[in-house]
Amino acid sequence: MTADGGARPRIRSYVLRAGRVGSGQARALVELGPRFVLPYQPELLDLDAVFARVAPRVLEIGFGMGEGLAETAASHPEIDYIGVEVHTPGVGALLKQLGERELGNVRVIQHDAVEVLTAMLAPATLAGIHIFFPDPWHKKRHHKRRLIQAPLVELLASRLAPGGYIHLATDWQDYAEQMLVVLEAEAQLENTAAAYVPRPDTRPLTKFEQRGIRLGHGVWDLVFRRR
């Protein structure tokens, strides 16, 4: 609460930057946006109607330029994917890939993920949640901005169907350690390993990660399931 009794603003885990939108991305936003982009609305989505079928649904938060999400969706046509991203160049890049690959099992929401989870996705509806390489906010004074905090993890777990999973990945060891502590403290979840897991096939290697591996950088994956 603030001094005047109002609600304290939520600290967001991202900063909106005016990134350059390429010509191909801009064209994809105009031509493919109406098909693939779902406008934010404070009411629950009917996912069966959105995808015109009944299938497992996986949410990916912060898909970046969309390379990994497009690859995963192409490899798993039996699963529907909902990608949430706030940055316009990334949304345009993913739409371009969806068009080129003729993928119909992805929808995009360009909005704050916490608000999407709270208002648009019903409890116990998701088969999985992916959050790969969220901003590490590596300076200690910025750790409060990190996405993976107890309130969000509780919200994420509530949107998973029983047996559904949360898969996190980071290349910052201290963030991986924080993730492990936070997820293990959530009563709705259980770890699928003693601590971290080898990279599952459901997380494709991106060019960024391949470069990091060549430079000797570590990557930590965590997979927890809803009890």
From Swiss-Prot:
Active site: 135
Origin superkingdom: Bacteria
Keyword Cell wall biogenesis/degradation: no
GO cellular component entries: tRNA methyltransferase complex
Keywords from the named record: Methyltransferase, S-adenosyl-L-methionine, Transferase, tRNA processing
Molecular function GO labels: tRNA (guanine(46)-N7)-methyltransferase activity
Catalytic activity from the UniProt record: guanosine(46) in tRNA + S-adenosyl-L-methionine = N(7)-methylguanosine(46) in tRNA + S-adenosyl-L-homocysteine
Chain positions recorded as substrate binding sites: 139, 171, 206-209
InterPro entries referenced in this protein's UniProt entry, alphabetically: SAM-dependent_MTases_sf, tRNA_(Gua-N-7)_MeTrfase_Trmb, tRNA_methyltr_TrmB_bact
Binding residue positions for S-adenosyl-L-methionine: 60, 85, 112, 135
UniProt record similarity statement: Belongs to the class I-like SAM-binding methyltransferase superfamily. TrmB family.
NCBIfam families assigned: tRNA (guanosine(46)-N7)-methyltransferase TrmB
HAMAP family noted in UniProt: tRNA_methyltr_TrmB (MF_01057)
Name this protein carries in UniProt: tRNA (guanine-N(7)-)-methyltransferase
Naturally occurring in which organism (per UniProt): Thiobacillus denitrificans (strain ATCC 25259 / T1)
Taxonomic lineage: Bacteria, Pseudomonadati, Pseudomonadota, Betaproteobacteria, Nitrosomonadales
